[in-house]
A protein has these predicted regions:
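N-terminal targeting sequences that direct proteins away from the cytosol to non-cytosolic compartments
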Residues: 1-162, 171-217
Length: 217
C-alpha cells in the first residue's frame, strides 16, 4: 500500500509537500489522522473495524475481536496525544502476535543549525539519558538524502528499560527533516519488526510535483 498525506506543520494545507510511505498492509495499519472526517476516523470505530478484518480468516475466542480492538485504539490514542501531526503506523502482523508496535513519521522545518548537528539532535545520538552509549549509524535514503539511525535504551518504569529506534534525514529541496521513531519496552518485538521498519525507512519519500494527480486517476 502506498499512502500519501500532506505533511508539515500545516497538514491541511493543500500546498504542503506530501509524504509517501509504501508499506505492506498485511503487517501494518495506519492510524487515521485526527483531521480526517470520514465516519471511520473515530478511533473506536476504526479499531473495531480493523480488528474484525484481522480476525476474518481466524477462529477467535469470545472477546478476542474486542480485546484486539482495544489494543489498537489504545495505541492510536497514545500516538494522537503525543504526536498529533505525525503519521502513525502500527506493526500488526497477526492479531495473536505481540504488540502492536507504533512507528511515528513526521516532517519538521529546518532550524538555524547545520544539518549534521540537527540530525544528531533529532535522533538523540548524544542524549545523556541513555543507559549506554547509543549506537549511531549513517542511514542515507535514496529519496530523502543523508540520514542517521540511532538505537538506544533509556530508563523506564520500575527499573525496566525502553528501547528506541530513531531515524532522521535532511531533505535539502524543502529544507526540512523527516523523523521516524519507535519506542517499546518489548525488545523481542522490536527486533522482530526491524526488517519491516527498515523497509518503511527506505520507502518513505516526498511526493513529486504532479504525482498526486497521477495517483488519483
Amino acid at each position: 500500500v502506498t499512502e500519501t498525506t500532506p505533511s508539515w506543520e500545516h497538514a491541511n494545507d493543500e500546498t504542503a509537500p506530501g509524504l509517501v510511505i509504501d508499506y505492506d498492509a498485511s503487517v501494518w495499519c495506519e492510524v487515521p489522522p485526527m483531521w480526517v472526517e470520514e465516519d471511520w476516523a473515530e478511533l473506536g470505530t476504526w479499531s473495531l473495524r480493523f480488528s474484525e478484518l484481522c480476525w476474518e480468516h481466524e477462529d477467535p475466542a469470545p472477546g478476542d475481536v474486542e480485546a484486539y480492538a482495544d489494543q489498537l485504539r489504545g495505541a492510536g490514542e497514545i500516538a494522537q496525544a503525543h504526536a498529533p501531526g505525525a503519521r502513525a503506523l502500527l506493526y500488526t502482523p497477526h492479531p495473536r502476535a505481540r504488540g502492536p508496535l507504533t512507528v511515528l513519521v513526521d516532517v519538521l522545518p529546518a532550524e538555524d543549525m547545520e544539518p549534521a548537528a540537527a540530525l544528531r539532535l533529532l535522533t538523540l545520538a548524544d542524549d545523556d539519558d541513555a543507559v549506554r552509549a547509543p549506537v549511531v549509524d549513517a542511514f542515507p535514503s535514496p529519496d530523502l538524502g543523508d540520514g542517521l539511525r540511532v538505537s538506544r535504551a533509556i530508563p523506564g518504569d520500575e527499573d525496566g528499560l525502553f528501547f528506541q529506534l530513531r531515524y532522521a534525514w535532511y531533505y535539502e529541496e524543502y529544507d526540512a527533516y523527516v523523523l521516524m521513531v519507535t519506542i517499546t519496552h518489548d525488545l523481542e518485538l522490536l527486533i522482530s519488526a526491524i526488517p519491516e521498519i527498515e523497509y518503511l525507512a527506505m520507502s518513505t519519500r516526498f511526493l513529486e510535483p504532479g504525482e498526486a494527480e497521477v495517483m488519483d486517476e
